[in-house]
């Protein structure tokens, strides 16, 4: 099902431009927007308050290096990531991701579509 709402289409295009090279994240945002379209059509207040803009844009993205020495004495440097989306309901949740196959788009996808809804319903 294609998105028809002009506001959602515009926001999706802006999200694509701000997150190039992150196809998994863009796919997840597209799916979320598709499912939220009926709600957005009925709730102008969500648009006025910029709720969806805040959903797709993290408050902070931290990328850092992690130097380490393997068992053979060889030095390696990996990247670590921490993405923090919204502190409105309390302290950030979620950990730091260090696996070599991970990149920023995957972290944003996981945190935005999996952890955030869980964190909204779980007691702190």
Task: Put a short name on every predicted segment.
Residues 1-124:
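N-terminal ligand-binding/catalytic initiation module
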């Amino acid at each position: 099902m294609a998105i028809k709402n002009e506001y959602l289409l515009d926001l999706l295009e802006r999200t694509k431009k701000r997150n190039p090279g992150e196809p998994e994240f863009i796919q997840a945002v597209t799916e979320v927007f598709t499912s939220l379209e009926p709600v957005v059509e009925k709730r102008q207040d969500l648009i006025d308050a910029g709720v969806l803009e805040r959903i797709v844009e993290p408050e902070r993205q931290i990328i850092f290096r992690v130097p380490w020495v393997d068992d053979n004495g060889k030095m390696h440097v990996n990247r670590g990531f921490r993405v923090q989306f919204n502190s409105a309901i309390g302290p950030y949740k979620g950990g730091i991701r260090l696996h070599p196959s991970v990149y920023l788009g995957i972290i944003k996808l996981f945190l935005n579509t999996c952890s955030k809804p869980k964190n909204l319903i779980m007691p702190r």
